[in-house]
């Protein structure tokens, strides 16, 4: 198994999924170059019959940011999911007039071809009735998974610290929560509090008996790293007591060669049955200001590259990212 490294340059928050047509789809944050007005302004897709083919596949823009108002700035971390027979994209966006007013939004494809068919806006993600907290503050990085016939969304929201919350949805209306969320994880350990106190970028990996939620922590520079929480698949996932959190990072800069700040990942099984992690990380040359588009503010530096690693499993079936 040999994948290009970087897999796709300048594509942070990479997300790869396999569709019902057997093809693989890739999306990611389209980068900003040095400032907020030079990027983060569209949603892109790639399609290939193989994971490897995504690295050179044509990149299509399927949606552009609005000129003003909601969904006009900071278009971040899109994820494409096939839910109840339809394609959806969850993404975060701010406003030209308030660029940090970040909230999650939803697009729906009107056909079965996400590359060529029309996408329509379903608007901002909606909380359940009586829930006046969800999406009331800076919130982003929404992901979806199904387990035992129930459908869940996980996202990051800054209610104090940036923490992860989870709630259920009706798969026929995945732009609405159907219950109040639980707090899944918040920054607790030193490695989650470097530069910023952050848990974000959730990614779900299911094994035969467990649900693992990997997440990214700390600031988005060299300190960026990944942790995990997990629960039994047969447990009540909406009961916080059923989740366990590891006290050490699952993947960090010291685990990699010539890569720094690994995070905001997704998981996919390739055409040969290999379990992969797709993540972004900067090259160490970035910190020597050799990237060509260096910026002191990590968010506006495009040198976060999409990369791929093989996930291994120990004798108990626990995933290992290192």
Each model region followed by its residue ranges:
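Carbohydrate-active catalytic/glycan-binding domains of CAZyme proteins
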Residues: 1-322
